[in-house]
């Protein structure tokens, strides 16, 4: 039984380590998809953005963007995605992070 627990814990911990840099979910959709969803559904995308930025804070550098509102974030991402419709959404969010945490 103890061997089973040790193997189980080792596999769970190793999966967490190897999956830390993998993007999942809405981040894999293209910018054109983000721009085409209804306003009510953009809340889901912006929730993904908040989670992604949080993960960047945990795994990489501490990000401190000041005076950035929810509406400003959404508007910036909409504008960027309008200009770059074929880029995946995660890259747009990375660009947003780069622009506002200089």
Stretch-by-stretch model annotation:
Residues 4-14:
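Sec-dependent N-terminal signal peptides
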Residues 74-102:
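Surface-exposed, polar helix/loop patches in the mature regions of secreted/periplasmic/lumenal proteins
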């Amino acid at each position: 039984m103890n061997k089973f627990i040790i193997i189980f814990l080792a596999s769970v911990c190793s999966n967490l380590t190897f999956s830390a840099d993998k993007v999942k979910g809405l981040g894999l959709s293209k910018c054109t998809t983000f721009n085409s969803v209804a306003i009510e559904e953009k809340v889901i995308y912006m929730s993904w953005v908040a989670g992604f930025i949080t993960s960047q804070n945990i795994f990489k550098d501490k990000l401190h963007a000041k005076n950035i509102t929810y509406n400003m974030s959404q508007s910036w991402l909409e504008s960027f995605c309008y200009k770059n419709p074929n880029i995946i959404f995660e890259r747009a969010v990375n660009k947003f992070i780069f622009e506002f945490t200089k």
